[in-house]
């Protein structure tokens, strides 16, 4: 199993880095993660996932892998960034004035997108379901967890 994962990581490393850098460069604050959400949804759709999203979720969404014949495991990431000016000088520095992923949410999203891609690419067989949940506004109170719960993202 590990060698299969190692090979997949070697084959996809550059794409994963590209995704993380795009996310880092385009941060958006809570409930305004429109571009971020659409980017992540687009990637999930390209992998073959069906996106579940509704008005109550605002910019949040989720995608399921597997079947309903067993437990559901939810893996969650945060879509939002912080209203903090980035002072780094890297080529993927935030292009949005006064907003940055100083919180690491760009890495969280990349981890979830990478896992979703690995599972789809290698057609992992599971009894149950993995729900990839992309939560908006984690940094706000009350934040996006409340809207995702109200929208039924924890049901099923």
How would you name each of these model-derived features?
Residues 103-105:
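Membrane-interface loop-to-helix entry segments
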Residues 107-156:
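Acidic/histidine-rich catalytic neighborhood of metal-dependent amide-processing enzymes
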Residues 2-101, 114-127:
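Acidic/His- and Gly-rich active-site-bordering loop/insert found
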């Amino acid at each position: 199993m590990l060698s299969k994962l190692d090979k997949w990581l070697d084959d996809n490393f550059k794409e994963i880095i590209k995704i993380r850098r795009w996310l880092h460069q385009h941060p958006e604050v809570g409930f305004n993660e429109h571009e971020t959400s659409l980017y992540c949804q687009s990637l999930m759709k390209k992998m073959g996932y069906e996106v579940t999203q509704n008005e109550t979720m605002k910019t949040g969404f989720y995608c399921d892998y597997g079947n309903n014949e067993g437990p559901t495991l939810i893996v969650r990431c945060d879509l939002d960034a912080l209203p903090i000016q980035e002072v780094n000088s890297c080529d993927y520095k935030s292009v949005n004035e006064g907003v940055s992923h100083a919180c690491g949410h760009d890495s969280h999203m990349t981890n979830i997108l990478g896992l979703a891609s690995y599972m789809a690419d290698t057609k992992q067989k599971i009894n149950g379901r993995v729900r990839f949940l992309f939560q908006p506004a984690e940094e706000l109170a009350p934040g996006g967890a409340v809207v995702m719960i109200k929208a039924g993202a924890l049901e099923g």
